[in-house]
Structures are given as C-alpha cells and as structure tokens.
Amino acid sequence: MSDILKKRSSMTTDGDNRAPNRAMLRAVGFTDEDFHKPMIGIASTWSEVTPCNIHINKLAEKVKEGVRTAGGVPQIYGTITVSDGITMGHEGMHFSLPSREVIADSIEIVSNAMRHDGVIAIGGCDKNMPGCLMALCRIDAPSIFVYGGTILPGHCDGQDVDIVSIFEAVGKFNAGKISREEFIRIEQNACPGAGSCGGMYTANTMSSAIEALGMSLPGSASMPAVSSRKSEDCYEAGKALINLIQKGVTPKRILTKKAFENAITVVLVLGGSTNAVLHLIAIAKEIGVDLTLEDFDRISKKTPHLADLKPGGRYAMTDLDKVGGVHGVMKYLLKEGMLHGDCLTVTGKTIAENLMDMPDLVPNQTIVRKKSEALHPSGPLVILKGNLAPEGAVAKISGLKKISITGPAKVFESEDDCFNAIMTDQIKPGDVIIIRYEGPKGGPGMREMLAVTSALVGKGLGEDVGLMTDGRFSGGTHGLVVGHISPEAFDGGPIAIVQNGDAVTIDSGKNLLQVEISQEEIQKRLKNWKPIEPRYKSGVLAKYAKLVQSATNGAITNLL
C-alpha cells in the first residue's frame, strides 16, 4: 500500500522514533505488513442494554473482514449507547440526548488519538446515528456509517405489534379497553429480537436520512438487522472504505447543503420523526453547513408525504424493505426531479449513478404512493412560530384528521406530573397540555414524551387533545403534538408564563403556535418570571445543561 493511504497513521507507525508505538500495536496483533496498510477505526455501539445494539458486535466483525479483504488493518473499539425505549417515561430519559454528544466525543477522541486513516461507525439505537455522524464530521477522514438494521415485527393475536403497541396498551389497559391477559401478551411479543424499533420512528428515520445524505451504502437503511443482507452490507462497507481512502473522499465532500436537502426530502416523503430536524441541524453544524428551521419549512411546503408508515400509517420498515426499500423510494424521487442526483456518496459515485442500477419500487405496491396520490400534498413535519415560539417549534401531522386546536391550557412543570394527570383522568377533550422545563437546559436533556402521548392515544384522546412542550417526542409519537419550542422555559421563553386556563392555539395549517393574550400581558408576566434552579448541580447532566444550545441549533454542545 502506498504511503498516500496512511496520511494520518504514518505519524503513529513510521520511522525509528515510533518503535515504541509499533511495539504496542504488535501486542494487539499487528504484523510487519500491517504497518504499511491504512489503519481503519471501527466504532461499535454494541451493548446488551438494548435490542437495537445487541447484535452489533457480529456486524463489526463483518466490517473487519471487509477491511482486511480490501487491504486495510482494522481496529474495533467501543462507544456507548442508551436505550430510548427502556429509559422512556422516567428519569433515565434525561440521559438520552446527552448520550448523542458522548458518542460523538468518544469516537472523535479515539480515532483522532489513534490517527485512523478511515472510520466506519456502526449504530443501532436513536442517538447512535447522529452521534456517529457528528463524530465523522469532526474527524473528516474517509468514513462510512453502517446502520445496525430494523427489528422484525412481533405477532400477537393475529396482528403485527411493536414497541409502540405496548406503550399505547398502557393507556388502553388503564382505560379498561383491553384485559390484563391481552396487555401481557402484547408486552411479551412486541420485541422479538435484535434491531431498532420497527416503524418510521427515529432510528429508521435517521438511517434513511443518512442513506440520502450519501454516508451509507445504497440499500443499507431498510435491511432487517437479522438478515444475511445486513451482514453483507457490513462486509461491503469495509471494502468500500479503502476505495474512499484511495479517492481521498471525506465527509466534507459528501455532506453539502444539497445533500442535506436530499435527506430532508426523504424524511418528509417517508413521514419521519421530528427528531430528524434536531439531528440533521446538529450534523450540519459539525460539518459547517448552514441548515435552519427555515430550510425544513421551505422543503416541507413543496414535498408530498407518500409513505404509509407507522406511527401515523399502517406499515413497518420491514414492509418497505420488501417492496424496494429506501433506495427504491429515492429512485422514484430522482425520476420525479425531487432529489439532487449529482451529490457525491461513500461509493465514490453520485446519488444518480448509485441508483441507476438499483431496482425500482415493486409494481402495484401500496406502501409508497405516487405524487399524484399523495397522503398529503406537503410534508408532515411542520415548523410553527408565534408568540409561544418566537424562534420556532416542530409538529408532525401525518395520519391526523385534525391539525389545529384552540383550548384551555393545562400546564405541567414536568412530564411525570402530566402522565399522572392523564392516568387519573384529569385531561379532557379540547384541553391543550403544556409540559415545560423539559428543554435542553431545563430538563436537562430534552426528554421524549412517548409515555405521555401513548397514554393519550390509549385513552382515546389522541386527536382530541393538543400537547406542546420544550422537550421532544419519540419517533413513535402521533397525535396533535408540538415539540422543540424555542426559547425554552428555562431560558425565559414565553412558554414559561402560560397559566392554566389561558386559551392556546396550535394551528399546523397556518404554522402558528400562540397563547391568546396580549403582547403587553406577555411582557408583564415575563417581567415577573423567575428562573428555576438547575435540577442537577453536578455530574454529566449539570455539565450538559451549561454547554447545550437551543433546539433551533440542534441542541449541540460543541463550541462552534
């Protein structure tokens, strides 16, 4: 191998002065020949804490094989993961979004310290994807992301079930709509094995976005975790990285503004998670691309929602995979002039070149509609502003018959208080719930509200109640909900001064979020507002709260 392939690792392995470095590398298996090969870091998020990542050690070994075959020398190392599903609904969820930053920091630290010539990151659970991409942006060596893959659906009483099924069953059981036996059966069958949550929830949304960005191999996003194709995907990624090193292609050449526009388009067409807004902005900031809420709003207004996928629709990612996958959707969008086909990807080819030889969506399939038969003529992710969110907020309207509400505010200072109110029947049709002090700083950690929204759906209130928060929502959430309200309550945003009984309006059709009081009254209340004490005085959450930026800036902690 030419020294041109060892631009980074040569400072670790070359010359007499690096004999001590080589001695230690020999102890981990390096041979004389290996010192002349590019060193490849394989960042593995393997963990036993979640089904999303339980299999990733095996995938990392397949990547390692591919790297070896192509002439590189691989080094697997670990980073963390947090299970969003298992931390949902309690104090543990405060740590989920901060884990994105730790993943990014740890991969940056290891691969920059070891001077890896290229990096492959493998992720499964929600925060893995953006965390890995943020790190690859910072390192800016030739890089590929590999998605661990989606879980297969569970089966219960003749129906497919998944993790959201059991979250919603909590509300149904509490309301007496299902028996304890049914409740237990759903719990026992919702998650049949390895892989990320199966609808177009956050993990599958971000895997789709990353394929559209050009940072994973074509077809990677929709393969099931336990399929032989996923193992092959990992092997091919290992080989492809050496090609990228030879061509000198790094994330800065791939992750352009047009690439992010492609990702946003794919997310909107698929009906993806609101978390994509937060994470794509964060990734863009790391690579130096100016991406804002206005970009999402602009693209959403001209992009139809085409895919009938959960949580708002009927189908799972495995169903989409059977009819052509995310790459099939992208091929259709390219033909319709909705994607930038000239964007470079990790194959060393453009989006258009990659899709040329990929199969079309299966004829007569019912999962992805044609533009002329769209589920909705514009995108399901809606950016709202108004006197409650001067800097912006994000709503998702897929699958909703009702996209606006005006009603009396029911104000809660935390998710926990709101959940208890729902379960004790204190929330009535027409109410607009406000959960505040759950933002990036105030939470801290911007908790996801899946327990709350699922309880509302289970109680039959999903479309009869509005909900807004400076926190976030799981990709599994559906209902008339608004998150990411900025400025957050902790920073003195107007959401902090809403009182019980104030008339509040959510109007996704008009992109409006407001409290029906005068500007003078808002200013008067803000003048009398006093900030709350930080909830954590030490440890990682205290540090995070001091560093984190607003949701409109992707809730990043990097000092950009």
Curated annotation (Swiss-Prot):
Homodimer. It comes from Leptospira borgpetersenii serovar Hardjo-bovis (strain JB197). Functions in the biosynthesis of branched-chain amino acids. Catalyzes the dehydration of (2R,3R)-2,3-dihydroxy-3-methylpentanoate (2,3-dihydroxy-3-methylvalerate) into 2-oxo-3-methylpentanoate (2-oxo-3-methylvalerate) and of (2R)-2,3-dihydroxy-3-methylbutanoate (2,3-dihydroxyisovalerate) into 2-oxo-3-methylbutanoate (2-oxoisovalerate), the penultimate precursor to L-isoleucine and L-valine, respectively. The keyword Membrane does not apply. Pathway: Amino-acid biosynthesis; L-isoleucine biosynthesis; L-isoleucine from 2-oxobutanoate: step 3/4; Amino-acid biosynthesis; L-valine biosynthesis; L-valine from pyruvate: step 3/4. [2Fe-2S] cluster binds at residues 52, 125, 197. Keywords: 2Fe-2S, Amino-acid biosynthesis, Branched-chain amino acid biosynthesis, Iron, Iron-sulfur, Lyase, Magnesium, Metal-binding. Its EC number is 4.2.1.9. One of its GO terms (biological process) is isoleucine biosynthetic process. GO terms for molecular function: 2 iron, 2 sulfur cluster binding; dihydroxy-acid dehydratase activity; magnesium ion binding. Binds 1 [2Fe-2S] cluster per subunit. This cluster acts as a Lewis acid cofactor. It is an enzyme of class 4 (lyase). This is Dihydroxy-acid dehydratase. Its cofactor is [2Fe-2S] cluster; Mg(2+). It catalyses: (2R)-2,3-dihydroxy-3-methylbutanoate = 3-methyl-2-oxobutanoate + H2O; (2R,3R)-2,3-dihydroxy-3-methylpentanoate = (S)-3-methyl-2-oxopentanoate + H2O. The keyword Transcription does not apply.
